Amino acid sequence: MRHSALLLAAALVAAPLSAQTDDGTTFRWSGTVASGHFIRLHNLNGDVRIERGAPGSKVEVIGQRTVRGGDGSLVRFDIRMRDDGDVVVCALWGPDMRCTDDGARGRYDSNWRRRERVSVALRVRVPDGVKSYARSTNGGISVDGVTAEVDASTTNGDVRVRTSSGLVNATTTNGSITVALGSAGGDAPMRFTTTNGAVTVYAPPALSADLEMSTTNGGVSMDFPVTVSGTMSGRQIRGTLGGGGRSIIMRSTNGDVALRRNGI
């Protein structure tokens, strides 16, 4: 009996990881991620695009290699399920990298990358209720139409997010951030930050929040009435929207910061 239970548990863990193919150019995976859990996407060199899938469908991931030199098949993909039920998808550059619960880890040989000039475009469809977590280093991130939480971060690239509901957090270093928020219950904070680029957030007219907007080299502007609780200038606003509540932080170093009504 105990042996049967162990086999069943192993099957349940392995099931979401089984439906995958890779022909050396295109990687495909589809599997179930429970509502309320994250699909966690880790790329290094290339864009990540996430779209809303059909209701009740599985998560679908396509990794498309673009090869400008070397052997594209040496860029590998790995999938793992975390103990908390989240599913991790990693694009791995080089033989010494591995996929962990926290993403791609291990020694990264930059000389190998120069020899194997490969980028990977990740295209993902998520059903309602599945949360999206996306990371890249050299590539943009776009998320369109999803219904649950989004956490998106890159180093060199723009971040664009449009949701109908759920929290959003977005960061980049060299790129702009454009976010269209839907409804977001609870009082968890949201952050939108970049170093070199603009930050623009479109929000519902009934938005209530404790707001902090700032830039060093640029301007701040907004379409909402605000009750000032701190500094208000051409480069910084700190105040309360509506009845206040969740913290919303919008920051840039070199770029404008704007809070607008309506959508992208």
Task: Briefly describe each language-model feature range.
Residues M1-L7:
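Bacterial N-terminal signal peptides that target proteins for export
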Residues G139, G157, G175, G197, ...:
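Hydrophobic lipid-interacting interfaces of membrane-associated proteins
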Residues A19-H42, D47-R135, D144, D151-S153, ...:
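Acidic (Asp/Glu) and glycine-rich low-complexity loops/linkers
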Residues A14-P16:
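N-terminal signal peptide c-region/cleavage motif recognized by signal peptidases
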